[in-house]
Amino acid sequence: MRVATCIMVACLVLTAGSVSAEWFGDVYIGQSFTEKSDVTVHSSAGLGIFRDVEFDRSLAYGGRFGRYFDGAPFLGLGVDVFNFSPRIGPQRVRVDGCVPSGGCNGGQGGTNKLDVDALAISLDLILRLPLLKTETAPWGSVQPYITAGMPLFRTTVTPRTTAQFRNHDEDTGYSFGYKLGGGIALQVAQNLMLFAEYRFTHVRASVELRDATTLHHAPLRMDLDTHSVLVGLSARW
């Protein structure tokens, strides 16, 4: 691993020319796939853990703006804004602890429908490898890259058809997560690149919904481990 890192850094140094660095603005769209997660609910009946809850596939979209450094044009910073909505559909799952139908000995339970909307804003570090340089593409007409960041997530959960929570009474929580990604950008016109990107994001979302019976707060927690496949356009100047 150390040898591979040294080779990559050496390649980046060798490909860094005397030209000044560049600004960039990206827009992208794609699909997100969120892994199964345990959902923890503290209701008036007690603690219940809904095991292996599935999330629907979601449209993902966003934008990114930033700049590569003058002294190291292979290294840049960007502000990324990213949205996806991994809805929880009606399903039967195993529940440990208190079940919505009553009793705290576990058993089968249903989630019914909850809307989940996640908006993330992140300051990303970007490392690119400029390949196939030309006069019209001084930073490379082919650019593999990797990114990493610690996004702030705003997660809104809205019960729609549940018996456990007060429906249409949403709550929003804020929490930090992390993001790792990689992709490749190809020049399609002067100052314009087409790119494809994979990213993985993680956040532990926490909100407080309303108990349908008592109207007291019912904290809900879940992990959103999400794989996103994106395509987009990048303006460079």
Give residue ranges: language-model regions.
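Outer-membrane beta-barrel translocator domains and adjoining extracellular loop/strand segments
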Residues: 37-45, 89-96, 156-166, 206-214
